A protein has these predicted regions:
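Acidic, glycine-rich flexible loop/linker segments
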Residues: 486-503, 667-736, 743-746
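Long, structured ligand/cofactor-binding scaffold of large enzymes
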Residues: 12-14, 19, 23-198, 580-628, ...
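Non-catalytic terminal/interface segments that mediate subunit docking, oligomerization
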Residues: 79-86, 306-399, 403, 522-659
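Mobile "lid/hinge" segments at catalytic clefts and subdomain interfaces of large enzymes
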Residues: 4-7, 71, 154-286, 380, ...
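Short glycine/threonine-rich loop-to-helix capping motif typified by GTGT followed
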Residues: 50, 150, 154, 246-255, ...
Length: 753
């Protein structure tokens, strides 16, 4: 499979070549107008003539146009792909090195340290990419989603990526879905991508943004309205005159953070902003092709939505969301100030950060730099640590050429590497800062405890780059740039003017250093070596098939209280080192989970001797003793990133069932992919009935689609309580369970060919 540093026009033309006909087929079959979401999905169905298309119920097989993987998740995905026995991927695929670079000093030094520290992993990813026909974007290329937007995304396309913020490509009208590595392996080996047909949430935007309001405030408001669970099982489709007023990169910001409401993905209709962005990034041919089918790259008149929300951009005010949950919204200034005083959050800001895949475009940086120039002209500097992460090498080179980097450095900013950095916990801070409660503001996406720097003392607030730079200058969490002033060195009071940005660089983009490696035409002679003594990479052994028995008297390894995100289940930060080594990464299993029985973090009771140990130690002991176990989650269990390690680790250590009041979509699928059984309490109150010494039995396995499962709690005194649990297994997914994993099914099917 030939893979280059861009999407070939032949692929785009092939997608557009069937779009009109298949959209017409969809209208005929459904008997109504179509949303844009439905048009794209129907055009990518494996069997558009016969596939059931009932929103929220039907499972469907899709043929995505491409796969993208970031370096932290690519390791496990490609270790799985290597076991399939194919000579190359069957769908265009790329690897992007962005997650393993620690932010500490600045771009040049940090990059050098990362290349040295991660040499074994980078060499593995580079060689496995070359062998199997995968495009390789080396360290320094930039954040996967910005690179995809600049080079691969196109209106009406469909892609999957092994990162939860893959929906960023919706800013160019693409259905882009975050998945676990096993889903990526399915597609790379030529099998369809199977997912439940999503509901469609319509968000009508009217008016236009102005002043200090930005695209980030749109998604912060959507998160407030829908909460972190409100988008689960749905694609969010934005439309209206307000949508057409937002730039392509602004649209991408909104789609990107749709992951924080649990949405499958988000998408905007094709418009002239997208066309101009395509032209500016060297893809005028794709814009011209999209223009020819433009009517099918927008929803039909009368398109139906399962839920409709309207937001007036004219009246939208800047927001700041946090701490600990991205839907905890406050108005900038007095709103967050009142909440801070009520909750004893520090008002002094210890750090301000601009970047991440959500907000690191040229437009984002120009708006922040316009505020910085005002400040520098009056002798002002940031009153806190100010860190900037460019989204890509192209962005870095362009903002350096255009003087924007210098504008930011003039007020005290440090420019970090083109990478994720602090957004995913790759940030080495001074211990004296994190030793006490401290507040940080950033333009990132997630603000879970310990997310950015590993410290439970850090309270993280998410907002726009504009507001971040203003708060950095004001020095306080409750600084409101629309009314508050800053005292200049000469004693005068400075009221900052609203930011002004440039959507696209007037002199075009500077591509910077070429960091892409195209795979050779024939990689068959390339050797991919994994040392048996490596502590970072480990070849995988297939999980064992189900033995045909019900699960009886399972001990409860862990019962989580409140949020239990994938960060709680499988922490990032320093643990990113072991993302390619299943045994070593399993040392972080549940270390962030709050024990519902005693409030402790990361530890519980070991049934073998009654002692208290860290969860990963207990899980290892159970595994060595041949004890299968279950875990209990609360609401939206597995919220957050797409990391499949949060499913592979429990499976590796003997976990067989995960119960929860509700699941996040990606994580629920990842659990099924690895042969576990995710079950939702039919009565959420059942969660409260489960005690530390209870044993739980799951009867009537394997799961039967659309039929609940009967379970039993056995108390220490021998008394029992029966309860019902729901599941979402499709017939195909039942086969994953029976085989031991979805990958085992892939191997079996390939062996038959």
């Amino acid at each position: 499979m030939a893979v280059s540093a861009g999407t070939p026009i032949s692929l785009v033309n092939a997608v557009y070549g069937t779009l009109v006909e298949r959209a017409a087929l969809g209208r005929k079959r459904l008997g109504r107008p179509l949303s844009l979401t439905e048009k794209i999905l129907i055009n990518h169905l494996a069997d558009p003539a016969n596939q059931e298309m009932e929103r929220g119920r039907s499972y469907a097989d899709f043929r995505p146009d491409r796969v993208a993987m970031q370096d932290a998740t690519a390791q496990m995905a490609l270790l799985q792909f290597m076991t399939a026995g194919l000579p190359e991927t069957l769908v265009p695929s790329t690897v992007h090195c962005d997650h393993l670079i620690m932010a500490k000093t600045g771009a040049r030094i940090d990059m050098g340290v990362a290349i040295d520290t991660n040499k074994e992993v980078y060499d593995f990813l580079r060689s496995v990419s070359a062998k199997f026909g995968i495009g390789f974007w080396g360290p320094g290329s930039g954040i996967i989603h910005q690179v995809v937007l600049e080079n691969y995304a196109f209106p009406g396309g469909m892609m999957i990526g092994t990162d939860s913020h893959t929906p960023n490509a919706g800013g160019l009208g693409m259905v882009a879905i975050g998945v676990g590595g096993a889903d990526a392996v399915d597609v790379m080996t030529g099998f369809p991508f199977n997912v439940r047909w999503p509901k469609v949430i319509g968000i009508k935007l009217t008016g236009s943004l102005s002043g200090w309001s930005s695209p980030k405030d749109v998604i912060l408001e959507v998160a407030r309205v829908l909460t972190v669970e409100g988008g689960t099982g749905a694609i969010v489709e934005y439309f209206g005159d307000g949508a057409d007023s937002i730039s392509a990169t602004g649209k991408a910001t909104i789609c990107n953070m749709g992951a924080e409401i649990g949405a499958t993905c988000s998408v905007f209709s094709y418009d002239q902003h997208m066309a101009k962005y395509l032209q500016a990034t060297g893809r005028a041919d794709i814009a011209a092709a999209a223009d020819k089918v433009a009517s099918e790259l927008r929803p039909d008149d009368g398109a139906q939505y399962d839920q409709l929300i309207e937001i007036d951009l004219n009246s939208l005010k800047p927001l700041i969301n946090g701490p600990h949950s991205p839907d905890r919204a406050h108005k900038v200034g007095a709103g967050v100030g009142d909440a801070a005083r009520e909750n004893s959050w520090p008002l002094e800001v210890s750090a301000a950060l601009i970047g991440s895949c959500t907000n690191s475009s040229y437009e984002d940086i120009t708006r922040a730099a316009s505020v910085a120039r005002q400040a520098a002209a009056r002798g002002l500097r940031a009153k806190t640590e100010l860190l900037i992460s460019p989204g890509s090498e192209q962005i870095r080179a362009t903002i350096e050429r255009d003087g924007l980097m210098a504008d930011l450095e003039a007020i005290g900013a440090t420019v970090l590497a083109n990478a994720c950095g602090p957004c995913i916990g790759q940030w080495e801070r001074h211990a004296d800062v994190t030793a006490k409660p401290n507040s940080i503001v950033n333009s990132f996406n997630r603000n879970f405890p310990k997310r950015n720097d590993g410290s439970a003392n850090t309270l993280s607030f998410v907002t726009s780059p504009d507001t971040v730079i203003a708060i950095a200058l004001g020095g306080r969490l409750d600084f409101d740039p629309t009314v508050d002033t800053i005292t200049a060195p000469d004693g005068t009071e400075v009221l900052l003017s609203a930011p002004v940005g440039e959507v696209l660089p007037a002199n075009g983009y500077d591509p910077g250093v070429d960091t892409f490696t195209q795979p050779p035409a024939d990689g068959s002679k390339i050797t991919v070596a994994v040392s048996p003594t490596s502590d970072r990479l480990q070849l995988l052994e297939p999980f064992t098939a189900w033995d045909g028995s019900d699960y009886i008297d399972l001990p409860v390894l862990m019962k989580a209280k409140g949020k239990c995100t994938t960060d709680h289940i499988s922490a990032a930060g320093k643990w990113l080192t072991y993302r390619g080594h299943l045994e070593n990464i399993s040392g972080n299993l549940f270390i962030g989970a709050i024990n519902a029985f005693n409030g402790a973090t990361g530890e519980g009771k070991d049934i073998t001797d009654g002692g208290t140990r860290l969860y990963p130690e207990i899980a290892k002991r159970y595994s060595q003793a041949g004890i299968s176990w279950c875990a209990i989650g609360d609401q939206n269990y597995g919220e957050g990133s797409s990391r499949e390690h949060a499913a592979m680790e429990p499976r590796f250590r003997g976990g067989v069932v995960i119960f929860a009041r509700s699941f996040a979509r990606i994580h629920e699928t990842n659990l099924k992919k690895q042969g576990l059984v995710p079950l939702t309490f039919s009565d959420p109150a059942t969660y409260d009935l489960i005690g530390e010494d209870d044993r739980i039995s799951v009867m009537g396995l394997p799961p039967v689609p659309d039929k609940p499962i009967t379970c039993r709690i056995t108390k220490a005194d021998g008394s029992t309580v029966d309860f019902e649990a729901k599941h979402t297994f499709s017939p195909e997914q039942v086969e994953w369970f029976k085989a031991g994993s979805a990958l085992n099914i892939v191997r079996q099917n390939l062996a038959k060919k």
